Amino acid sequence: METKNLAIDALRLPLIILVVFIHMNPTFDSVGYWGLTINTIAQVAVPCFFVIAGYFFVGNKPLTLEMYKVKLKKRVVTLLIPYLLWNLVPSLVLIGGNLFSIVFRGKSTEDLMTFLTDLWNDGVWHLWWDKVNGMPSDSPLWVLRDLIVMCVLAPVFYYFIKKGGKLAVVILLLLYVFLPVSWAHLPGISVIAVFFFNIGLYLRYNGIDLIGGSRMYQLACVTTAFVLLILAVLFRNQEYLYSLFILVGAFCSFVLIGWARPSVVKCFAKFSPTIFFVYAIHQTFVLSYTGQIVGRLLPDSYIGAVLHYLIVPFIATAVCMGIYYLMNLVSPKFLKVLCGGR
């Protein structure tokens, strides 16, 4: 069991790199099938995080009221407090940048006052819910927002899984594949969160390991994921192919990390404490500035665009980790609060 948990910790590293790839927002015109293929693969990252969260929410014992209360109290520290703090960061960065320009460059205060006025008039609470296109202020943390909601609703889901069994999974699968887009991305209860969190609950409730399975299952999973990836890329307007690839691709991720050498697993797992920090900070300013700097060093061509797309996520992830380790030296207690005690 410890080996499998270590593998799950190790999986978080490639998953977070894939998340950074997602936020590169590639276009087909700029990077062609390279970008489209990698971006499609990257979409499995968030579902994997939800599966892991659902799997470990239940534990080995039935979900009782007392256990539920204990778990919610822990989630206040591990999820809610970091969520509230991190969603202040983009606004603080913007305010800080404006103040710097006002003091050192003589810039007018108009932009800063407009931002603060709009923030107040729109409702400050939107920072933590739907500030940016249905996402919170620190946009990648929509995942954390939805995960908090999933944890609150866990007893409902647990009862649904317990009584519905495989039928419950089939119902959720149909909703996941065929639910209209306008319903699929409701803030707090996105279909991705509901489906994959419940998959994690179902697997744990039925004693099915995330890592492992028969050799036939593993080969079938990897083969099916590969075929669906090709189809999803070639027929990129067919949403159901895209959804099916993400589903099978998520399970394929657990298979592939199970195939990794023990030395690779141990190496990847060492970075597990940094993953939440990278997730929270990369979109606030690191990815943008890294992209600008690397972009100046590459030729303005198709090759340059592809190299930019392939290189920047790794550099941005490394920079985020560097900030994490620096903060761990300077202010480990504050860092621990920001990372939910991780």
Predicted features along the sequence, with ranges:
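Membrane-cytosol interface segments of multi-pass membrane proteins
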Residues: 1-173, 297-342
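Transmembrane alpha-helical insertion/packing segments
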Residues: 1-43, 181-197, 201-226
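Aromatic-anchored segments of alpha-helical transmembrane domains
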Residues: 17-24, 171-184, 221-235, 278-285
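A generic structural signal for nonpolar/aromatic side chains embedded in well-ordered alpha-helices
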Residues: 20, 203, 268-271, 278, ...
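Interfacial loop-to-helix transition and helix-capping segments at the boundaries
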Residues: 34-46, 131-146, 180-196, 230-252, ...
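Hydrophobic transmembrane alpha-helices
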Residues: 55-59, 150, 154-159, 193-209, ...
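Small-residue-rich segments of transmembrane alpha-helices in multi-pass membrane proteins
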Residues: 82-86, 225, 275-282, 342
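Alpha-helical transmembrane segments and terminal signal-anchor/GPI-anchor hydrophobic tails
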Residues: 192-195, 208-277, 284-293, 299-309
